[in-house]
Amino acid sequence: MIRTNELVKVFRTEEVETTALNKVNVEIKEGEFVSIMGPSGCGKSTLLNILGLLDNPSGGEYYLLDEEVSKYSERQRSNLRKNNIGFVFQSFNLIDELTIHENVELPLLYQNVPSSQRKERVEEALERFNLMPRQNHFPQQLSGGQQQRVAVARAVITRPKLILADEPTGNLDSAHGEEVMSSLTQLNEEGTTIIMVTHSPTYAEYGTRIIHLFDGSVVTDVKGKPMV
């Protein structure tokens, strides 16, 4: 599903040049749950942004679904993103002015899904994540754990092949963190490929693989011990 070859990302200003990723080679198969760990500033989020087609590499190759996508135009990246990738962020990234139902529905609007189908699919997602009683509430009326479950529901509403999660439990207490990890695990068991950046060794163990980055390079890539 995913393969990078000598992937490099360099950030430049007039005064300094910073190498965020240094010849990263990873291969991720369909159906895997991969946790990415490492200290702050090691390149975890940079790698996730490139894998999610939110940024371009400075060098190397990136293959997604057997296509070399590193030189794609913004329109090509956008089309590939909206049809194949779901995102879950640490800060939830919900729109405060929209209800929970409307937040979850939003990606379907970009896909031009008919109204009747949107309603059915949104309600199905809300039921799955125990959010139906909250569908007419606004994000600020929900707990952190509930907001993150809304974010996960929004990420899966388009039925993506791949979910990218950047510190999805970072703003949550342990109980709500476990809820989110349980949701991601269930999605993975149903066949969705998941790549998750985390600082937590405990949550990293939910992955079938754990990749450690340091100074922009992969230093270890080992099998995890999935939580039961």
For the regions a protein language model found, what residue spans apply to each?
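ABC family nucleotide-binding domain
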Residues: M1-L213
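Conserved beta-strand-loop-alpha-helix hinge in the C-terminal portion
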Residues: S217-V228
